[in-house]
Each structure stands twice: as structure tokens, then as C-alpha cells.
Amino acid sequence: MDLASLRAQQIELASSVICEDRLDKDPPDLIAGADVGFEQGGEVTRAAMVLLKYPSLELVEYKVARIATTMPYIPGFLSFREYPALLAAWEMLSQKPDLVFVDGHGISHPRRLGVASHFGLLVDVPTIGVAKKRLCGKFEPLSSKPGALAPLMDKGEQLAWVWRSKARCNPLFIATGHRVSVDSALAWVQRCMKGYRLPEPTRWADAVASERPAFVRYTANQP
């Protein structure tokens, strides 16, 4: 594995990320959520993609792609492992969204190219990274109250907002993926909350990918 080459690719791709609002449709009609996981001891990569109407946040479509994993887990290079399955799920959708929430980092990455940014560049769609853990940067401690907020900073640059979406839950790291500003990324995540830790797009993507009870109930109620 030529990590020097991959690192150079990351730096080059990151230079093309657009960190300002360039949505083709604002507000969007459809918002997607994307989540990637691994099965069979990592041999299979699974990507779930859901489509939600906006502003109702009603689930209207879901697809799950499973492909052979082509790259081992290497910290800092996860997007190269995940994006092939995301592209496969993207191609399965009957209609394309105006905005995509990706479970993972956007520019809040040491080389400013998390999976949300990488995927957004590949398909040229506005994306937001919604991550559950910090990958780089520093932030001031948050209060325990829901709504607590702090910028994630690295070398004088704001990479994300750190936001406690729910009491007694760890905060989310909300970042530009591509074609969305960091402030708009936070605003869109906040608009898509329904009382859970995660915004509805990535909450549903996770539920579909892992066949959680919410998804089982949803499928049971479908005609």
C-alpha cells in the first residue's frame, strides 16, 4: 500500500473542496443519509443510503450496497476504503438528492479529506460530515446542556462545529463535506433533528444498514 501516493491524492483532492454554499436547490427537496459499515470480519463493505423528503423528513427510499472490501483499515485513509460502496449505493438510487449527510468526517480530517468530502467531490453533490468522534483539532469543553456548541479548531482554522445534540450524549462533529459552509452544515443538521442524538438522515441510514428496530417497524408497516 503506497501511503505516500494516497496522502498526495488526499492533499490534491482537498484543494478542490468547496467550503461555501453551492446547493443547486435551496431548500432541498430530498436529503440523503449515508452510512458505511463492514461485515464478515471486514471482507465486505456495506453502504446504506436513504432518501428523505424535506422538510417532512419522511423516508421515501433506501438502498444497501455490499461489495468486496478492497483496502485494509488504515487510520487517516478510511475514505479510500469506504467510498467504493458509497458509489455503489448512490448508483442504486432511483432519484438523486440535493444534499447528503454522511456518517463520518468532512474537512475535519488531518489532510482535510474525510469521507464526506471525498464522496462529495466524486459525485459533485453538496455533502455534510456528521461524525461521532474527533479525528483532529481541539475544542473548548462543552457544558452538559443540550445545544452546547464550540468550534473545532486546528492551526487557526475552523474545521467543524462540536455540538451536543442531546443531553447525556456525546457531541457530534459537524463539518463541511463539499459545497456547504460549516455554519450551514450545522444549521442543516439542526433542522433535521427529531429528538435523537443523530439527525434523521444519518439516523435512518444507520437503522437501515444495521436493521435496527426503527427500520424493522418501518418495513413491517409498508404495503
UniProtKB/Swiss-Prot annotation:
The keyword Disulfide bond does not apply. Its main location: cytoplasm. It is an enzyme of class 3 (hydrolase). One of its GO terms (molecular function) is magnesium ion binding. The keyword Acyltransferase does not apply. One of its GO terms (cellular component) is cytoplasm. Belongs to the endonuclease V family. This is Endonuclease V.
